[in-house]
């Protein structure tokens, strides 16, 4: 895959077109990436022992790798 974790990318298609962020994770089999601050989704959580309050939790969802363009690569050590 042309994108690696830590690369800075720009979204070129979809509802978040034009936004920039860093790649948090990659799913190679499904060809999808999770970008920080892009494609925010809300999940409703029931109260449980680990999460006593429950409520609405907001996190990043994955987007298809073809919808992002690499701006700068992560510098290797």
Curated annotation (Swiss-Prot):
Q: HAMAP family in the record, alphabetically?
A: Ribosomal_uL24_B (MF_01326_B)
Q: Which GO terms describe its molecular function?
A: rRNA binding; structural constituent of ribosome
Q: Which residues form a coiled coil?
A: none
Listed A to Z, the keywords are: Ribonucleoprotein, Ribosomal protein, RNA-binding, rRNA-binding
Tell me the protein family, please: Belongs to the universal ribosomal protein uL24 family.
The ranges of region (Disordered) come to 42-61
Provenance organism: Lactobacillus helveticus (strain DPC 4571)
**Source superkingdom:** Bacteria
Name this protein carries in UniProt: Large ribosomal subunit protein uL24
Gene Ontology process terms (BP):
translation
Entry's Gene Ontology cellular component terms? ribonucleoprotein complex; ribosome
Q: How does it assemble?
A: Part of the 50S ribosomal subunit.
What this protein is reported to do is described as:
One of two assembly initiator proteins, it binds directly to the 5'-end of the 23S rRNA, where it nucleates assembly of the 50S subunit. One of the proteins that surrounds the polypeptide exit tunnel on the outside of the subunit.
């Amino acid at each position: 895959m042309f994108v690696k974790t830590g690369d800075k990318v720009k979204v070129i298609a979809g509802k978040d077109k034009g936004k920039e962020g860093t790649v948090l994770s990659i799913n190679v089999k499904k060809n999808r990436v999770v970008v920080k601050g892009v494609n925010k989704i809300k999940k409703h959580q029931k109260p449980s022992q680990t999460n006593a309050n429950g409520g609405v939790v907001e996190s990043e969802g994955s987007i298809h790798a073809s919808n992002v363009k690499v701006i700068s690569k992560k510098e290797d050590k």
